[in-house]
Amino acid sequence: MTQENQTPPPEQENLAADPAVETTAETPAVKTPEQEVAELNQKIGELQDNFLRAKAEGENIRRRAVEDIAKAHKFAIESFAEHLVPVTDSLYAALNTDAGDAKAFKEGLEITLKQLLSAFEKGRMTEINPAVGDKFDPHHHQAIASVPSEQESNTVVSVLQRGYTVADRVLRPALVTVSAPK
């Protein structure tokens, strides 16, 4: 048993006797500088290609966004205009009739006005029509004149022209006269 422990098995003997087998198994193959340069140039080419593709994609996204914004501006009023077409039709119909009756003509105008106000509402456009005695609001009213009145100062005495808002933004303030301070 002591002899068996002292003599290595034949497989270990072969490995120990052949140093070339030992070094190639443990160390990777050494690349020549030309091979390393070729691999690095290939990687550079791949990275440049990826960069150019990403840059082109970014430019395409930006171009499409600009086109989408231009279309949105161009056709933003389209929905509102669709609601105004029936109003225009009613006005043309009124002009083409030979209505001698003022009452019927007035009724037609009232119906057309209701159509117009409905179109305004659908387009998120609302009237600013302050009542007499309302407090003057400089954000929604424009004072044209200040007149002596029995009302409290800075209140609406009369409305000369209605104002309008679009989605809570004042399109035109209501033109009003206000009471002068006493």
From Swiss-Prot:
Recorded superkingdom: Bacteria
Main location: cytoplasm
GO cellular component: cytosol
Disordered: region residues: 1-35
Gene Ontology MF terms in the entry: adenyl-nucleotide exchange factor activity; protein homodimerization activity; protein-folding chaperone binding; unfolded protein binding
Gene3D superfamilies for the chain: 3.90.20.20, Head domain of nucleotide exchange factor GrpE
Keyword DNA damage appears in the UniProt entry: no
Cited HAMAP family: GrpE (MF_01151)
Subunit structure: Homodimer.
Name the UniProt record assigns to this protein: Protein GrpE
